[in-house]
Amino acid sequence: MTRVGQRDSPAKEEAPPATKKRFLTPGRFVTILCIINLINYVDRGVIASNGVNGSSKVCDAKGVCSAGTGIQGEFNLTNFEDGLLSSAFMVGLLVASPIFAGLSKRFNPFKLIGVGLTVWTIAVIGCGFSYNFWMIAVFRMFVGVGEASFISLAAPYIDDSAPVARKNFWLGLFYMCIPAGVALGYVFGGYIGNHLGWRWAFYIEAIAMAVFVILSFCIKPPQQLKGFADKDSKKPSTSIETVAPTDAEASQIKTKTPKSKNLVVLFGKDLKALFSEKVFIVNVLGYITYNFVIGAYSYWGPKAGFGIYKMKNADMIFGGLTIICGIIGTLGGSYVLDRINATLSNTFKLLAASTLLGAAFCFTAFLMKNMYAFIALFAVGEILIFAPQAPVNFVCLHCVRPNLRPLSMASSTVLIHILGDVPSSPLYGKMQDHLKNWRKSTLIITSILFLAAIIWGIGIFMNSVDRSNEVSEDDEVEEDKLESKTENSTLA
């Protein structure tokens, strides 16, 4: 065999070069991720706002009809079709999330985020140019592809970049952008829809995201993801001897399985390992139930508020309420978890308690006849309901080994949507079409939060271990074998 890539060790050890202070500090990097997340969820609020979503044509007993407004009015959608439109992004998210999670082991994760955000931007522009239900529904599906690249990879970056004592608070800042973004979307969509037309809300979103598309291809994260090799750097040859294959070895390489098949096999092993984690299963089951209600609230909240209490400017009221309560609740929940020692058992205690109390306040709020009593009780309920936003994702990140975190986040995202807010929006619409009573429909959907609290309560009594610092030699060997196969196949 011919040995290549060997270098003699230097006779004299050179002094390390002076390190320059990087402009992109962990704090600035996390700020960029938070803004991207905010814009993403502004889009969720925009599509649900009365100014953009609008209302269908209404006819009175005399047959006199008033013209519809927004998307629903222009495309003449039923409540069920309208609910489907809110969930269409999930098709892209479902397909693309596991793909991006798998590709993160072979390609630079942050560049993958850039690819996804490019798709997101183009799809949002397409929403503005749509002229019927099916066209805008297809573009909403591609919006989900863009979100898939970001949602499964951003949280592990934050988990690695944050100081140990403030991990949950930094995650809280990131997940605070969910309620804040949706709420800003209500306000932004209502204002732009009423003044410039619903299509312009999408165009402005795309312009805002385009800046971060460019950044994602130009900047390098301040820290490499734990459990992953640096895909942009070449492997050092100082400590490892590289051996050129003999003719016999080369002939064996030709019979190796192709790169794509190796990736599929490795992905299958990762998926099996993930779903063998009982803590992950219980956490996600509670998250699915929780998100079923949150999805219905986020899409139908302004319309329910108008239908029950005849609120003027329901978009503004729900938007403002959700911004304030979402920020307080999300940051409050993450701060409390950091203070009480963020073990997995303590996290489940916080999840169960805050959801149970939040459900009680929200249920009582919708029983109130007085609008101001409703707002006061619902505000307290929202603060408590938003408290789990960071802790539930902390469990997803810390109940698995580091190299499984993107897949854990991707799988969690897929499941909470496909079994949570995706069916809840159209089912709520179908229930309202049948009951024709906004109060009853909302009370029924709110009661499901009690089930989420019970499921998370089970997690308190499980034998849970924080695995975020585990390094599996078996995994490293498997990935080295995979890389060796794919690299050597080019030599054969």
From Swiss-Prot:
The modification Phosphoserine is found at S472. It is found in: Late endosome membrane; Lysosome membrane. Gene3D superfamilies: MFS general substrate transporter like domains. Its main location: membrane. The chain crosses the membrane at residues 29-49, 83-103, 119-139, 141-161, 169-189, 200-220, 279-299, 317-337, 348-368, 372-392, 407-427, 442-462. Residues 472-481 have a biased composition (Acidic residues). GO terms for cellular component: late endosome membrane; lysosomal membrane. GO terms for molecular function: transmembrane transporter activity. It is a multi-pass membrane protein. Signal peptide: none annotated. It comes from the Eukaryota. Probable sphingolipid transporter that plays a central role in endosomes and/or lysosomes storage. Belongs to the major facilitator superfamily. Spinster (TC 2.A.1.49) family. This is Probable sphingolipid transporter spinster homolog 1.
